[in-house]
Amino acid sequence: MSNMIKHIDYFPAGYCSSHSGLLFKGIPNEKMQFPAGVFLIHHREKGYILYDTGYHYEIKKKARYFWYRLATPMQMKKEDQIDYLLQERGIDPASISYVILSHLHPDHLGGAALFPNAHFFVTQEVYEVYQKPKLKDLIF
């Protein structure tokens, strides 16, 4: 079973800035950067599996993300988007078989539309939280 995973790669697909006091209790309130990390798992039988998809570049333009951008300003170039990063490594985004989303914030699911051939997975808990989300669930 341990030989099922050929390798795991990490991609920084943009980052946001926020104050630690908004996100964590009991620590000094300092401005911090939070990378939108994406992991690519190369499974011997299942092919390529992504864990999260990072930001989508269009979040910088879409009005519906105004409050998110205000609370957690995001920085990225178009080339930081996960489809570009994969193509730089010679991996066709259409070859991604599965995407596991840790949760449904824009820095984790933003690039989901870039993988139309993939099967998507979330935990039951994530699914239930987003049936009736609170504002904090959508941002932090």
Task: Describe each PLM feature range.
Residues 48, 55-140:
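Active-site HxH/HxHxD metal-binding segment of metal-dependent hydrolases
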Residues 10-12, 122:
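Structural signal for conserved beta-strand scaffold positions within catalytic alpha/beta enzyme cores
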Residues 1-4:
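Basic/polar N-terminal segments that are highly enriched at the extreme N-terminus
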Residues 6-7, 15-84:
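Conserved beta-strand hairpin/beta-sheet module of binuclear metal-dependent hydrolase folds
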